[in-house]
């Protein structure tokens, strides 16, 4: 048996052990993606084998929380793919206005950049006051960072261009306070935001929504888990609600391909049919 085959077996055992011990379910994540992340963590933790990593993770919850940062890839940016946000502003917002109150679910919100981007967009369109945003993720460390809303000033300078290209209407600096090399987001942007732990692999729907945003998350799932997540989104959305996905994601070829219709297909914006 080759060493690579041994490693694949060890990874399956580690993923199963994490599920049994900590109830985090990575069993239906993309095999190639999860393997790449675990092998990267292996080098960072100076473990010779995945089995050695498993022993440390099982007996040290702190080590598991460190590993979780590698497994969940907490990387995001504000107004990522500006054309997407411009399409939401121009094509989705006019239709959202027809509802007296709006609920938005941002699934896999990571460290919150997408949440603040959506809140800024909705504020500029006069909808934030009557909107509740549910921001969910499986990584508690990422959720804590999202709640704090503190980002590096270097990042904010990069996000400013995204904001402008996404149709931003104000001075981006109005939305944060600069302090010691960081940007602290205006706390009023999260007045109507509920941050919550939620797993697309194991949890169920918790509210009816008009808009679900889950961008650059499904690409890390296998087909079964993609279908499960799309099922949750379909169940959550009200009649004619909106689903927005990442640039490399689609409902095509899924079990729910006939239950959504494209609204702005190049920007991966769909509507429940």
Curated annotation (Swiss-Prot):
One of its GO terms (molecular function) is S-adenosylmethionine-dependent methyltransferase activity. The keyword Isomerase does not apply. Gene3D superfamilies: Vaccinia Virus protein VP39. Residues 1-273 form the CheR-type methyltransferase domain. It is an enzyme of class 2 (transferase). Keywords: Methyltransferase, S-adenosyl-L-methionine, Transferase. Its EC number is 2.1.1.-. Disruption phenotype: Mutation does not affect chemotaxis and biofilm formation. S-adenosyl-L-methionine binds at residues 76, 80, 114, 137, 199-200, 215-216. One of its GO terms (biological process) is methylation. This is Putative methyltransferase Cher3. It comes from Pseudomonas putida (strain ATCC 47054 / DSM 6125 / CFBP 8728 / NCIMB 11950 / KT2440). The gene is cheR3.
């Amino acid at each position: 048996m080759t060493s690579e085959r041994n490693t694949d077996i060890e990874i399956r055992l580690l993923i199963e052990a994490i599920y049994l011990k900590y109830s985090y379910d990575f069993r239906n994540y993309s095999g190639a993606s999860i393997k790449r992340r675990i092998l990267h963590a292996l080098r960072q933790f100076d473990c010779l084998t995945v089995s050695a990593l498993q022993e440390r993770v099982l007996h040290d919850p702190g080590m598991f929380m460190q590993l979780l940062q590698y497994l969940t890839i907490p990387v995001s940016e504000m107004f990522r793919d500006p054309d997407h946000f411009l399409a939401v502003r121009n094509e989705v917002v006019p239709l959202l206005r027809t509802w007296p109150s709006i609920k938005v679910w941002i699934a896999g919100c990571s460290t919150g950049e997408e949440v603040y981007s959506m809140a800024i967009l909705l504020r500029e369109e006069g909808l934030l006051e009557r909107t509740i945003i549910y921001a969910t993720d499986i990584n508690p460390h990422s959720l804590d960072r999202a709640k704090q809303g503190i980002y590096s000033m270097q990042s904010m300078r990069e996000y400013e261009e995204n904001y402008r290209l996404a149709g931003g209407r104000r001075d981006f600096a109005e939305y944060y306070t600069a302090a010691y090399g960081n940007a602290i987001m205006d706390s009023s942007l999260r007045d109507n935001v509920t941050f919550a732990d939620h797993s697309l692999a194991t949890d169920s729907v918790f509210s009816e929504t008009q808009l679900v945003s889950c961008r650059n998350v499904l690409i890390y799932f296998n087909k079964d888990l993609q279908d499960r997540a799309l099922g949750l989104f379909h169940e959550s959305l009200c009649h004619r609600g909106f689903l927005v996905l990442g640039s490399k994601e689609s409902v095509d070829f899924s079990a729910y391909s006939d239950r959504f219709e494209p609204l702005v297909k190049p920007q991966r914006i769909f509507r429940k049919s």
